[in-house]
């Protein structure tokens, strides 16, 4: 489940996955075709949708189950249901538009898993290649991007995948499309798809007995694609997959993609396997003459230089990778990190007004001039009229921790500057602290909040893996770059542990944020990644209560007594039970029984993928 978004039907014994209509009919015939015998399969027309195949009167009836914008499932014109299983249960008691009640499920044979579609098989590689090319990311940054943005990337890939296919030729004229198809082999079933206009319509050009046939592909008001009077599809690749199995209104099946100019020698980028499961007799294209039996995989891609994928300027929601702070400015080989990360004051300009203030001094917005231009920065300026060396040491300690950290979900230090005051120059996160943002923006969805806290868990997992304890993890110290991009900040209390240490012991009780602290911190002054996990539980509570203060109206001592009694904060009103269960797990009293961030991040990731599906 960690690598693939969970299919909400995979656990159902009567779900067969990405099988064709004909395969479904064959299975139900094997099952005896009794009235009310049914199975569930993946829709080959609609993203995230399903199809119900139901036997009645010795015939098989097929019903499309669409996934609605709200995330619910419904048969056209029917009631909405939270899941495919709930829909099936409902129709086993109410026909409500079906030809009969669902009486008996036809289950997969033992050991047979639901069949994944060919696009599913290639999706991981498509995503990896897309991220590499769109944002020029590699290594750790690439992996972090794929994990945190998987749902958005899957949607993006699903709707733009046709642009990377050899059969898609972009905006060319009718005459040019005929010219291209007639170059080289003239086998029946050779085809290409071209863009017709800016309204989202296309044309399918198909070779039949030496003649090029043109079929218009229109997009309706809901965004669905179809040839006139044909089946409707969410994407072009689903349409091509369908017509490569059967003609269904075309003169013949699509069998040989016409390659784009200059692509014949470098046609394959990821995989040359035939479509998974193609040999099945159930998948032989109906009405396809013998000369068209060449195995054709509509998912084999063009080489990288042929990619026309969505660029950053396209009309889509900005992802963290689109921002200037996803990678360190020093990741650019032209930007040389100054020695001891000491910055030249002349290259730093400060703006009027404050972003925030605290015991240490103030934070201002500024710009730091680098080789590739001025970068917006946040500058922590030390207030030290009394010239107290302890305050300076504290700032330098924070700088020392920060300069060792490099992760997309942690505020990076650009450098330090000694001038009219000591200054810590950091990445800018324009939207400010998470708690304040959520207090002012109650419209932010549960999915959006889950996305943000998952990013925080990724940043904390990185700290845990690198033996750093944050010691001040709270919603006020999570800064937002955008509504969909969070970074952990404020490392003033953070400690680096040596390789053989797993906790830090403070010498005395300081000005500590006790409402965020685990029992072992208060009782024994012991701090570890596991105590950060406790704080993360409180941070999640703050996020899902839209920035409310934890333990409102209670003093630190009262909070400690409440925890010793085994009591915990109540579930916030808008918080899903799965998230609250994870909070309670983070608030496990015994530190040895409490999960680490590896487990917490994975659990949040899986939940986020589930609700994004």
From Swiss-Prot:
Instruction: Give GO BP annotations, semicolon-separated.
Output: adaptive immune response; B cell receptor signaling pathway; blood vessel morphogenesis; cellular response to hydrogen peroxide; cellular response to molecule of fungal origin; defense response to bacterium; innate immune response; integrin-mediated signaling pathway
Q: Which UniProt keywords apply?
A: ATP-binding, Cell membrane, Cytoplasm, Immunity, Innate immunity, Kinase, Membrane, Nucleotide-binding, Repeat, SH2 domain, Transferase, Tyrosine-protein kinase
User: What catalytic reaction does the record list?
Assistant: L-tyrosyl-[protein] + ATP = O-phospho-L-tyrosyl-[protein] + ADP + H(+)
Pfam families from the xrefs?
Answer: PK_Tyr_Ser-Thr (PF07714), SH2 (PF00017)
Main localization (coarse) = membrane
In this chain the SH2 domain maps to: 14-106, 167-258
Q: Where is the Protein kinase domain?
A: 349-613
Q: What is known of its domains?
A: The SH2 domains mediate the interaction of SYK with the phosphorylated ITAM domains of transmembrane proteins.
The family line of this record is: Belongs to the protein kinase superfamily. Tyr protein kinase family. SYK/ZAP-70 subfamily.
Designated name of the protein: Tyrosine-protein kinase SYK
Q: Which lineage ranks, top first, belong to the organism behind this chain?
A: Eukaryota, Metazoa, Chordata, Craniata, Vertebrata
